[in-house]
Amino acid sequence: MNVFWFLPTHGDGHYLGTTKGARPVTLNYLKQVAQAADDLGYYGVLIPTGRSCEDSWVIASALVPLTERLKYLVAIRPGIISPTVSARMAATLDRLSGGRLLINVVTGGDPDENRGDGSFLDHSERYEVTDEFLKIWRRVLQGEAVDFEGKHLRVQNAKALYPPIQKPYPPLYFGGSSDAAHDLAADQVDVYLTWGEPPAAVAQKLADVRERAARKGRTVKFGIRLHVIVRETSEEAWKAASTLIEHISDETIAAAQKSFSRFDSEGQRRMAALHDGRRDNLEIAPNLWAGVGLVRGGAGTALVGNPQEVAARIKEYADLGIDSFIFSGYPHLEEAYRFAELVFPLLPEPYASLAGRGITNLTGPFGEMIANDLPPQAK
């Protein structure tokens, strides 16, 4: 099992949909989140992409030398950048990070943003471009001089003279809910990602991708993207969930849902259908809450509960075949600690160990000394 955290390069705070309790997302703050994730033993961090975020490649490049073990899941955007240039960027960052780069393949689900970035392709064309892009990208990073002529992309003698550390190339992660997305995942990527739908729906998606991959003689790993609200008691967790959205007005929800309706993303449509823009019935499965999706695009669901409940839901998804879990919580610095402290001990190794991923406690016992003389009691 690999557990990721999230870098909030699009903003952070105590509440959604308001400036109340918000905090500036500076390089120093992102460094704190990344270093906390590194020290706590998270496998990696996802860096979001798009016009609402700081650039993911610049952020990753700034944070790589400030962390030791943490991997960075960074987006590439077929149709927006050349596959050859993207491959060379990936090779460089993989080398400079000591092999800590992971690649998130993003086709882009907002036509308005895509047009602003110079891409006027429809949904099916974007997947055609992504397929051609990855065929070039993968071969370039394996050391080939690539000649390729497809429907959308053409290169001659495309090459990267400096290879990546990871072989054959940094692992490819990819998410999408349409048939075209499932075909692409089955054919080209290493890890298929889904947003946090109820377990039965996730099981259907995984089975479909697994079957398509088997027909091509391939196997694909699976991951899930979820928020998490965990507290020592279930009552506290559900109160925290309500508090997170207490400052969102109905007008803000309506405006957000109107914006999402222009997307041609099947995954975004499925997220919106979980709540229909209403806040009166947000627990859509045991301990699975759709409140985040009222105003946030992309991943819109959270696991909510006490540590045992959250761990049980994680195991439920793991039993479906999920082995990468990408979590986040508001605010991201505090919640990175809270999740690690409350839930890691209930997860499989290496997370079940207080030492995390081999991190040793060099300063003495955990907790503050008692009366300047006694170590804190172990529990």
Swiss-Prot record:
Signal peptide: none
Disulfide pairings: none
Enzyme kind, highest EC tier: oxidoreductase
Catalysed reactions, semicolon-separated: an alkanesulfonate + FMNH2 + O2 = an aldehyde + FMN + sulfite + H2O + 2 H(+)
GO molecular function: alkanesulfonate monooxygenase activity
Keywords, in A-Z order: Flavoprotein, FMN, Monooxygenase, Oxidoreductase
InterPro entries: Alkanesulphonate_mOase_FMN-dep (IPR019911), Luciferase-like_dom (IPR011251), Luciferase-like_sf (IPR036661), SsuD_RutA_monooxygenase (IPR050172)
Gene Ontology biological-process annotations: alkanesulfonate catabolic process
Enzyme Commission number, as recorded: 1.14.14.5
Summary of the function given for this chain in its UniProt record: Catalyzes the desulfonation of aliphatic sulfonates.
Family as reported in the entry's similarity comment: Belongs to the SsuD family.
NCBIfam families attached to this UniProt entry: alk_sulf_monoox, PRK00719.1
Protein name: Alkanesulfonate monooxygenase
Organism of derivation: Pseudomonas savastanoi pv. phaseolicola (strain 1448A / Race 6)
